[in-house]
Regions:
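Alpha-helical interaction scaffolds
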Residues: 1-261
Length: 261
């Protein structure tokens, strides 16, 4: 109960203070079931509060690095259990909390069921964001994140278009690090695969537009400087329009200046 209460109070502003309290309680845990339940709770919170997935990723990294569990546990037990549960929820079609809740939805009407299904999709999307932030914070390796990307491309497509949405969520968050760390061949193969998927006849226009964001992201690197924060595609297009406008004015001005020379 104390751990759940502290998790509910966790904010970016209070991160250091609350996370220290959480770690102090974890250090006193003697039961593996209690530890498992707490890890489930963190993952569920991260899935539900997906806007704060970076904060929950940093919490788990801090716990894995600084907590000192009882000697009855094997070394790095928190990290091992946490990553195993993250892997399960990533690979499976639905996170554990959705699977657990779904049997209770049998008697819901159409609109209530639609709300629950939307919540289920948001939980999955939240988990993808958590995985992305674990990679950004170096808890997952380049090799693992490449496996995650290929999981959605090779194993899921075109069974469920939602998986391509989750792929886009993942890549948009990690793209800058992915571009710097992964081998150039991996990047070229990835974007070639995306291009082939977009050109296929089995996708809806909606999904093709979402995937096109990844194409634009790849092409926009010619515009974004490495030291700058990644630009939104809308801002990139605005910048392109401005640059084209400036160039047009310059050409027009040069033509007139030559006439008066």
């Amino acid at each position: 109960k104390n751990l759940k209460s502290l998790l509910n109070k966790l904010t970016i502003e209070k991160f250091d203070k609350i996370s220290d309290k959480i770690i102090n309680i974890i250090n006193d845990i003697l039961n593996l079931d209690v530890l498992n339940n707490f890890i489930d709770l963190i993952i569920q919170k991260a899935q539900f509060d997906s806007n704060f997935s970076d904060m929950y990723a940093k919490l788990c990294i801090k716990i894995s690095k600084t907590c000192k569990l009882n000697n009855t546990f094997e070394p790095n037990i928190f990290k091992k259990l946490f990553l195993l549960k993250c892997q399960d929820d990533f690979i499976n079609d639905e996170p554990l909390q959705v699977k657990t809740a779904r049997p209770k939805w049998k008697n819901l009407d159409k609109y209530e069921l639609e709300d629950k299904n939307n919540w289920a999709k948001e939980c999955k999307k939240g988990h993808v964001k958590l995985v992305a932030n674990l990679y950004l914070n170096n808890m997952l390796s380049d090799k693992v994140i490449l496996i995650c990307i290929n999981h959605y491309i090779k194993n899921q497509y075109p069974k469920d278009e939602n998986n391509l949405i989750y792929l886009c969520e993942l890549v948009k968050i990690i793209y800058n690090k992915m571009k710097q760390n992964l081998h150039q061949n991996d990047m070229v193969n990835f974007i070639d695969t995306i291009n082939k998927i977009i050109e296929s006849d089995v996708l809806t226009c909606r999904i093709k537009f979402i995937l096109k964001d990844l194409q634009d992201l790849y092409l926009s690197n010619k515009i974004c400087n490495k030291d700058e924060k990644p630009m939104k595609l809308k801002d990139i297009r605005i910048q392109l329009i401005k640059e084209n406008s400036k160039n047009s004015k310059k050409i027009y001005s040069d033509k007139w200046s030559k006439k008066f020379q």
